[in-house]
Design a protein with these regions (language model features):
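Serine-dependent protease modules
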Residues: 1-153, 157-158, 167, 174, ...
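Edge beta-strands of extracellular beta-sandwich domains
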Residues: 221-225
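Exposed beta-strand face motif in extracellular beta-rich ectodomains
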Residues: 206-208
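Generic structural signal for well-ordered beta-strand positions
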Residues: 97-98, 183, 219-220
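Conserved PDZ fold ligand-binding element
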Residues: 171-194
Length: 231
C-alpha cells in the first residue's frame, strides 16, 4: 500500500510513502548542476507498457526552459517514449541525475529530443512536498514565453512574448493575454534571465513590476504581489 504525501502539478512530481515488506536500497542522487553536454546517460522506463527498458544517449543541453520560467530541463537524445515519464535518468555510475518528463515530437513518438527534470530540482520539490504537502514557490500564473525583439521609439528592445497562459492566477486576473509582450521587468531589461531570477529569488510579500506592450492598449504597467503557488 502507498500513501500520497504531496503533488506538484506544474512539475508533474508526486511523493508517495510505501509500506515495504523488505528493506529497499535508495538510488544515489548526483548533483545535476555538474552535468556537461556530451555526458553519457541512461533513461529507464516502461515505453508503451511493454516492460522496463533502458535506452542510452548523451546530454544534449542543460537549462532548457521549454518556455516555462519556473522550470529548466535537461535535454537528452536517449529514447524517451510514452511510458518513460517518471522514470529515472541516470549517469554512467548509476546515480540519478533527473526524472524523465516530456519529449518534443511531431508524432508523439521519440524523435531524439527528450527532457528530464534535473535531480537538484526534484530534491527541492520533494523536500517541500514532504515538509508541507505542497510546493511553496513564488507564482504569478502558469505561462510560457518566447524571446523576441521589438522596435520601440526607434530603438530595438529585447522582449518576451506570452505564447501560452492558463486562465488562472494574477496574470490572468490583470487581463494579460496570449501575445501580450513583456517589455520591462522590475524596471530592467525584459529577457529570460531577468524573468527567471525575479521569480526564483524573490520573497513573499514583495512586488513584481512588469511593463507590457499590447496591441489593444499599447503600453501598460502592472504590479504583482508574489503569492504562493496554488497546486
Amino acid at each position: 500500500p502507498a500513501k500520497i504525501i504531496g503533488i506538484d502539478k506544474n512539475a508533474d512530481i508526486a511523493v508517495i510513502k510505501i509500506s515495504a515488506d523488505e528493506d529497499l536500497n535508495p538510488i544515489n542522487i548526483a548533483d545535476s548542476n555538474s552535468l556537461k553536454v556530451g555526458d553519457r546517460v541512461l533513461a529507464i522506463g516502461n515505453p508503451y507498457g511493454i516492460g522496463i527498458s533502458v535506452s542510452n544517449g548523451i546530454i544534449s543541453a542543460t537549462g532548457r526552459d521549454y518556455g516555462n520560467p519556473y522550470l529548466e530541463l535537461i535535454q537528452t537524445d536517449a529514447a524517451i517514449n510514452p511510458g518513460n515519464s517518471g522514470g529515472a535518468l541516470i549517469n554512467e555510475n548509476g546515480n540519478l541525475i533527473g526524472i524523465n518528463s516530456k519529449i518534443y515530437s511531431n508524432t508523439g513518438a521519440y524523435q531524439g529530443i527528450g527532457f528530464a527534470i534535473p535531480s537538484n530540482v526534484v530534491v527541492q520539490i520533494a523536500t517541500q512536498l514532504i515538509r508541507f504537502g505542497e510546493v511553496k514557490s513564488l507564482w504569478i500564473g502558469n505561462f510560457r514565453v518566447s524571446s523576441i525583439t521589438l522596435k520601440i521609439n526607434e530603438k530595438i528592445t529585447p522582449a518576451l512574448r506570452i505564447i501560452e497562459m492558463e486562465k488562472v492566477g494574477p496574470l490572468h486576473e490583470k487581463g494579460i493575454k496570449v501575445n501580450d509582450i513583456i517589455i520591462g521587468i522590475n524596471k530592467k531589461e525584459s529577457n529570460w534571465n531577468n524573468l527567471t531570477q525575479s521569480l526564483r529569488f524573490a520573497t513573499l510579500g514583495e512586488n513584481l513590476i512588469l511593463e507590457f506592450y499590447t496591441f489593444s492598449e499599447k503600453f501598460k504597467t502592472h504590479e504583482f504581489e508574489y503569492t504562493e503557488e496554488k497546486t
